[in-house]
Amino acid sequence: MQIALTGATGFVSSYLANVFLEKDWKVTPILRDDLALSSKDLAKKIDGSGVIVNLAGANIVKRWTEEYKKELYNSRIDTTIKLVEAMGQMSRKPKIFISASAVGIYDDRGRYGESDYNFANNYLAKIVKDWEEAAFRAREINIRTIVFRFGVVLGKGGLLAKMLPSFKLGMGGTIGNGRQSFS
């Protein structure tokens, strides 16, 4: 199995890459420089990959200046559009395109599932809506498309490891009012 993977240095994708390699699957990392290539050249790089996994995107745990909001948006939507364009030009198209998304599409008023369409009306929800729309364009070229709406991802070296020192020093405090959801 040959898999092409964006966001290869990220938290989730670096873990996934190791899982794929342990199964003796060939992993082709798609780096930022590769995304600057023309769609045709990117298609050549990933040609023959049976699965394309798109986990690219700037880290949302930073200060959201107007400039950084643009980076958050472009690193997801532009990357996804470029990948779909490249897949359309591949001589051997992938069977599956898996793209990340986020639970930030939902408002904070209840419990939601994948068939709910009562989305939030904020900047993060706009990013997610546009991101999913860009990913689902792969269906137009007959590629099975799967979108995962990630919430907080917990794992070794992740968010909790960064928060723990403050809590150990007694500076962590209560997070929220205790009634908020955790996804």
Task: Locate predicted features.
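Conserved glycine-rich Rossmann-like NAD(P)H-binding loop of the short-chain dehydrogenase/reductase
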Residues: 26-32
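N-terminal Rossmann NAD(P)H-binding glycine-rich loop of SDR-like oxidoreductase domains
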Residues: 3-23
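Rossmann-fold NAD(P)-dependent oxidoreductase module
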Residues: 15, 19, 86, 134
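Conserved Rossmann-fold NAD(P)-dependent oxidoreductase catalytic core, especially the SDR/UDP-sugar
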Residues: 81-122
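NAD(P)-dependent short-chain dehydrogenase/reductase
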Residues: 125, 139-141, 146-183
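SDR active-site strand-loop-helix element
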Residues: 6, 52-56, 97-103, 148-150
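Catalytic helix-loop patch of NAD(P)-dependent Rossmann-fold dehydrogenases
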Residues: 110-147
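NAD(P)H-binding glycine-rich loop region in Rossmannoid oxidoreductase-like domains
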Residues: 34-82
